[in-house]
Amino acid sequence: MRLNTLSPAAGSKSAPKRVGRGIGSGLGKTAGRGHKGQKSRSGGGVRVGFEGGQMPLKIRLPKFGFTSRRALVTAEVRLLELAKVNGDVIDLNTLKDANVLTRNIQFAKIVLSGTIERPVTVKGLKVTKGARAAIEAAGGKIEE
């Protein structure tokens, strides 16, 4: 048996509907679309959320919130990713050099996910309570 010789069991798959192929098929001429109207045309149909000209729900409801610009340049760093960084001092630039963070990131926060075995010094980064405890338990320290 080879992958290129596999085929489904006989009768398990039905043939696709072939529309517009003559009267005898039952789907000739208008091909199941009916007569005239927007939905019978090529490319016909309305966009998602269109309500026939009535003011759509999306516009009837009030706007709310905004996208924080700071959130776009902030990232979370897991404890296990700190192992990729060479050296004992970890700051924003060393994380970027180790390809843990992309170049556009300006703020980072270390979160407790995974473990860290070696002692490291974290400078100028935010750290969660759990991550702080794990870093200090490994013999490291956090400098603001």
From Swiss-Prot:
GO terms, biological process: translation
Stretch list, region Disordered: 1-49
Entry GO terms, CC: cytosolic large ribosomal subunit
This protein's UniProt keywords: Ribonucleoprotein, Ribosomal protein, RNA-binding, rRNA-binding
GO molecular function: rRNA binding; structural constituent of ribosome
Bias-annotated ranges (Gly residues): 21-31
InterPro entries cross-referenced by the UniProt entry: Ribosomal_uL15, Ribosomal_uL15/eL18, Ribosomal_uL15/eL18_sf, Ribosomal_uL15_bac-type, Ribosomal_uL15_CS
Keyword hit for Transferase: no
PROSITE patterns to which the protein is assigned, alphabetical: RIBOSOMAL_L15 (PS00475)
One Pfam family of this chain: Ribosomal_L27A
Function comment: Binds to the 23S rRNA.
HAMAP family: Ribosomal_uL15 (MF_01341)
Similarity field: Belongs to the universal ribosomal protein uL15 family.
Subunit structure, as described in the record: Part of the 50S ribosomal subunit.
The name this protein goes by in its record: Large ribosomal subunit protein uL15
